[in-house]
Regions:
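Core dinuclear metal-dependent hydrolase active-site scaffold
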Residues: 3, 17-19, 107-131
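Short Gly/Pro-enriched turn/cap motifs at secondary-structure boundaries
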Residues: 6-7, 100-102, 117-120
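Conserved beta-strand hairpin/beta-sheet module of binuclear metal-dependent hydrolase folds
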Residues: 1-43, 128-140
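Active-site HxH/HxHxD metal-binding segment of metal-dependent hydrolases
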Residues: 32-111
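Residue-level signal for the nucleotide or nucleotide-sugar donor/cofactor binding architecture
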Residues: 61, 114, 155-156
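Alpha-helix C-terminal capping segments
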Residues: 18, 61-68, 109-111, 165-172, ...
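Metallo-beta-lactamase
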Residues: 118, 123-191
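Hydrophobic "anchor" residues on beta-strands that sit immediately upstream
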Residues: 24, 50, 70, 137, ...
Length: 191
């Protein structure tokens, strides 16, 4: 498995390009589709699809510009992708209406060699993606190296976030964590 990391947009959103035996996909195409496509070309891969850890604008802004037919996201996150009131695009001076076909994911689904973990709280349909063999967790805005996602946006729920963090805390702790913002944490260990 190969992975490249890009930090994009006003908020320094972490965007990841992952290539494995299932194909190549982008996690959270924050903005600037051309930068993402150039990085994929440097990797020698053609991006097959997009997956969104959640539907906030700083994670979806380039989703419709990558020339792909569909995006994958949790079934409870579709309203954020489609509705600028919920995806917060107005805060960035835009009005983003998702235009791609949505493939709806659920907790426990397999996606391109990863397991989907539903982690509501920051948003209703937030997800993490976990690959046990590679010990990789893409945590979106659920969990960061030094904190967790905010819950004061529409659809946020602190009690749900606490449950999601507890779910992640029960996992094996020696995974590499790739969050939606900030530093990547290699070999996470419980303290």
């Amino acid at each position: 498995m190969r992975m490249e990391h890009l930090q994009l947009g006003q908020l320094g959103t972490n965007c990841y390009i992952v290539a494995n035996e299932y194909g190549a996909f982008v996690i959270d195409p924050a903005c600037d589709a051309q930068v993402i496509l150039r990085k994929a070309e440097e990797m020698g891969v053609k991006i097959d699809t997009v997956v969104l850890t959640h539907g906030h604008y700083d994670h979806i802004a380039a989703a419709d510009e990558l020339g792909l037919e569909m995006v994958h996201l949790h079934e409870k996150e579709e309203m954020l992708y489609l509705n600028p009131e919920y995806n917060l695009s107005g805060h960035f001076g835009a009005a983003f209406f998702g235009k791609k076909q949505c493939v709806l994911l659920k907790d426990g689904d397999a996606f391109m060699g990863f397991t989907v973990i539903h982690t509501p709280g920051h948003t209703p349909g937030g997800i993490c993606l976990y690959n046990e063999e590679e010990k990789m967790l893409f945590s979106g805005d659920t969990l960061f190296c030094a904190g967790y996602g905010r819950t004061d946006f529409p659809g946020g729920d602190f009690d749900e976030l606490v449950k999601s963090l507890s779910k992640l805390n029960r996992m094996k702790s020696d995974y590499h964590m790739y969050p939606g913002h900030g530093e990547i944490l290699l070999n996470r260990r419980k303290k």
